Structures are given as structure tokens and as C-alpha cells.
Amino acid sequence: MTFPAGWMWLALCRRHRLYVILRPGPYICAEMDFGGLPSWLLNRPGLALRCNNPLFLQKVAAYYKQLFDRLRPYLGENGGNIIAVQVENEYGSYGNDKDYLRAVAQIYRDNGVNEF
């Protein structure tokens, strides 16, 4: 989903009383270039992707802060139509860093997202 088209799509789903399961990443899917991650992450010394790397998690937290601030009205607990938010995607076939998954889930919680 691209934005602002994504916001229009969420509003349309809400208007028609359709529920949404959101997949905001950080890794979205193999069908998108680099899984939806920005390629400039590769140029950051010391940054490792999709693991419990503090530099990566810092970038993830900044992304989620911006995203979830805008999504908050659409969350189910706020009367919206987002009923679930996926933590990562296809991670079991890539890695098994449970600390990373817990850290991403905590970033969700820190931003008021509990639908996962």
C-alpha cells in the first residue's frame, strides 16, 4: 500500500465496515524490492537488518512512530477497523531472533498498538 493512497484505502474500508489486518513490516514481503525496507539502510555502518541490532531498531522505531501516529484513529481499540497488526513477515523462514521480535512488539506497544 502506498501513501496517501493507503489512507484513502483505510478510510474506504472503514466506510464499508471492512476489517483490516495491517502488515507494516519492518520487512513487508519478498514481492517488494528489498522487502519494503529502504535501501539506504545498507549504507549505515554497524547496522544489521531484521535482528536485534540497536541501530536497526532505532530506525524501525522512528518509522513506526510516524506511521502509528497517523494510524491511531483506525485501530480497533479506538473504534477503528484495524483488528490486527502483524509483527514482521515470514520471519521464521529467515531468522529466529526472538529478542528482535519481542523488541518490535514492544515498539508497537510503546506507540499504543496492541492489536497483534
Model-predicted segments: where are they?
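Low-complexity, compositionally biased segments
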Residues: 8, 36, 91-93
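Aromatic- and acidic-residue-enriched carbohydrate-binding clefts of CAZyme catalytic domains
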Residues: 2, 30-55, 84
